């Protein structure tokens, strides 16, 4: 809009935004859609003759390197100049190319005449620059292109623009994978959402730059900018620090039959490409993510599904044409969820490369299903290059397990999952690479699970503190430096069952790229172990409230001499006696995560709830029942995971304890009601059935609750805690659940001796 009439007077500029329109992507997705204008806003003043700034939001200058080799390379500069004056203009356009060291490589100059109100397109290519310094993630050499527009007569500078470019070439091959500058190169990548608690997506430029620095520190060389174009500051750091990039527009889940949707998708694609065309880090443009996921789950009948598939195929073909019109120097891609239907309907053959979002061993199946699926795809489509565009498992630092399994959200299962996936990606030559989902624990408004509204598959927390698993990747990917990390920062408060005065043996894992590690507890050596898959696990004896754990490894990466690398951490430990009858229970608070194999440490109280166990004489445990779980959010508590697991059909619970007065606390949440599940759980639904549950609670033959109903006292999916003081004269506390309707259940139990 023209504001000349408003110059030299005070003005207010207001912008009203609305993201509710259904003809603008994204219309759905497994991430929170924050609103508002959250990127930088610039008010740009220009001369009457200037570079074209209204070309889909670009800067009006497009730079590429059409001819590149180790011996020589050329730079192509094209763009448009506008003359907004009422008379013709005689101009001079100069392009100066600077070497990475700042010296001038070449200068191009031309004279231009533009009629009043018209636009001029220019195109200039340098003569060959000999022995160019190639751009790679390890050596991100950048050449600067300075474009200067002057008045031909007065030499007055009318407009000026600076852009970086890099000399590199690349290829994707179905058998050989990815190559950069003529050499095989594994894409070691991360997907990145952009939010951060508590500011949503309104990150500062410094925050965007910090994220790329963290990825580079880990050893990543590739980023999938998912699922939407992100801040210029991010791509600037990709160029400068060396991070290959995949950028995409947010066409997700389903293609609606909405007027204008196709046109807006096309516009989104042109905007992304033109705005970010000059970044040498970008190697691929994407335009669809899991586009059949919602489609196939919502529409089962062929007459409903067929027109949607036809729309989807038509849009993909149209966008592929647009992409190649805009940029022939990069490749196209789409990301598919793990279903061969993409190939069956024809989507798999449209783009240059295919991305697969695979979660075998998390949402379903087992871990080895990952490599089996990839092998099947490669056998069927051997010429089609593949990237594993998503893989990951959730983790909650409050949850830990010595028997980790899928969807328990323990830190240990995420580690187990990724320790399986990464070697497959690294060792399979036809896989171009992978991008872990996700770099951060990000906001997802539709998710419940252990951390409601959060998808917790990140390698770092929302505040960007690295999880222990971050250092597994660092050990695997950073072969230029020694890495040694005791992987217990996410588990500093430990507990375990102690038999007599014997220490409790618990695993301590170390991530390292050094061949051998020695571990110490309170200064005493536990010996040395060889590294396997960048990890070493020691069985460590815990017996007191605090231990200092230290790891030491010989660093043979040093060129001049051999040195040692060390890491240390303090761990808190609470022993729980196996024989309660023979112990002093005065200071004991025995808390049990009923129905779960996980330790749970409350981040509010630091109290650790132990995994459940069957009753044994002189000890404690459940009698009867089976484990059940739900991923629905539990209200009225911040300790949701404690209430998402339970023992269903439990007959009783028993503690063999000395006589005295005890406080018993029961945790209940009735999860036995149908509730909505999100399609993004990829078919992993709760296994509970609808029913009303009522039962009596009996302690040492005394009925303390008749026809108890958790849902009547606190509603379904609401946390309920009930405490009772019991005088024990029997050297045992025996709890029985007598069913009146449905089944009995228990989510948690806590015992504390008062007197």
Positions of predicted regions on the chain:
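Intrinsically disordered, low-complexity Ser/Thr- and acidic-rich flexible linkers and loops
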Residues: 297-309, 676-687
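Acidic (Asp/Glu)-rich catalytic clusters
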Residues: 185, 239-241, 272-280, 345-348, ...
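Acidic-and-aromatic substrate-binding clefts and catalytic sites of carbohydrate-active enzymes
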Residues: 223-231, 254-263, 339-342, 361-372
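Compositionally biased, intrinsically disordered or flexible polar/acidic segments
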Residues: 568-755
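Substrate-binding clefts and catalytic carboxylate motifs of secreted carbohydrate-active enzymes
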Residues: 33-36, 43, 49, 281-286, ...
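Alpha-helical scaffolding within the catalytic cores
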Residues: 172-176, 230-235, 266-275, 334-345, ...
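Secreted/periplasmic carbohydrate-active enzymes, especially glycoside hydrolases
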Residues: 4-225, 237, 242-245, 268, ...
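Short, solvent-exposed turn/loop segments enriched in Gly/Ser/Thr/Pro and often Arg
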Residues: 18, 166-171, 190-194, 224-237, ...
